């Protein structure tokens, strides 16, 4: 593609993001009219950011501190890249360049900032308990499980992406006695042919105190297939709610039915990638999505 072919797309992208910036500001003001005090303040934060800065996934100033953060990538004797997360090694796929590792880990640091709408542990009440059995569903690189590995009694990491299998094995090799990596999807039905399992079938004879899930919008299917587990075993849960516009409402409904109280993470995310790539139905008013729902009982 030559420079003349690039210009129209670039201008189109700028036009779309500017349109969305103004549209979200308008929606923030409209939503705030009937919002409670907390939500009104959160909406004002988004509006204030977008009045000064460009449209972005996390419309908050905290993201600026990660622009130039220094991230050291090292490699083990087999050439596998890793970063230190505290004193623990977090591994990435061997074929990844150091720069790709740095960019990926920067995204983790950004989304898990205490001010981020995607932050899992924004306060101590969200922490797993000592000796808890944790299900990390959609574990990816495993940072969540790694952060809580020492307090956990057992950790089950559900991750199907092949490129993460070896990095996960290396990351958790010091704790292999209490970590199980399960190469299955979690959904609302058991289906061996499609490699799906429900929480209810997997944990039928196992302890499960804590469930964290980030599974591309399938969190409601996980809840449907985990009714007995949630009703009788789980005490705390973190469920991502940003993939689909109505996920927050659906997740809250399941949690209430299962006897949980719930609260959202602070702030909102602006999930516009699909819209900017041509899927107009993927990003609609009121545009703002909660990142994570915390449930407890």
Task: Name each model-derived stretch.
Residues 1-297:
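Phosphate/nucleotide-binding beta-alpha loop and adjacent structural elements of enzyme active sites
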């Amino acid at each position: 593609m030559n420079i003349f072919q690039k210009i129209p797309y670039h201008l189109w992208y700028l036009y779309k993001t500017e349109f969305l910036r103004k549209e979200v500001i308008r929606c923030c003001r409209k939503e705030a009219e009937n919002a409670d005090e907390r939500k009104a303040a959160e909406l004002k934060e988004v509006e204030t950011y977008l009045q000064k800065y460009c449209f972005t996934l996390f419309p908050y100033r905290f993201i600026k501190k990660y622009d130039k953060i220094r991230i050291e990538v090292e490699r083990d004797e087999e050439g596998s890249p890793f970063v230190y997360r505290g004193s623990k090694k977090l591994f990435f796929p061997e074929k990844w360049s150091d720069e790709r590792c740095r960019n990926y880990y920067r995204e983790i640091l950004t989304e898990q900032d205490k001010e981020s709408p995607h932050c899992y542990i924004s306060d101590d009440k969200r922490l797993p308990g000592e000796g808890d059995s944790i299900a990390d569903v959609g574990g990816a690189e495993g940072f969540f499980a790694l952060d809580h590995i020492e307090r956990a009694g057992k950790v089950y990491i559900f991750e199907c992406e092949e490129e993460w299998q070896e990095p996960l094995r290396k990351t958790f090799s010091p704790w292999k006695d209490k970590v199980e990596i399960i190469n299955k999807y979690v959904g609302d039905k058991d289906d061996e042919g499609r490699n799906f399992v429900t929480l209810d079938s997997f944990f039928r004879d196992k302890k499960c105190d804590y469930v964290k899930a980030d599974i591309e919008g399938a969190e409601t299917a996980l809840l449907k297939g985990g009714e007995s587990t949630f009703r009788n075993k789980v005490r705390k849960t973190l469920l991502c709610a940003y993939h689909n516009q109505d996920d927050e409402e659906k997740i809250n409904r399941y949690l209430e039915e299962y006897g949980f109280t719930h609260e959202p993470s602070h702030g909102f995310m602006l999930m516009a990638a699909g819209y900017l790539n041509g899927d107009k139905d993927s990003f609609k008013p009121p545009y703002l999505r909660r990142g994570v729902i915390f449930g407890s009982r």
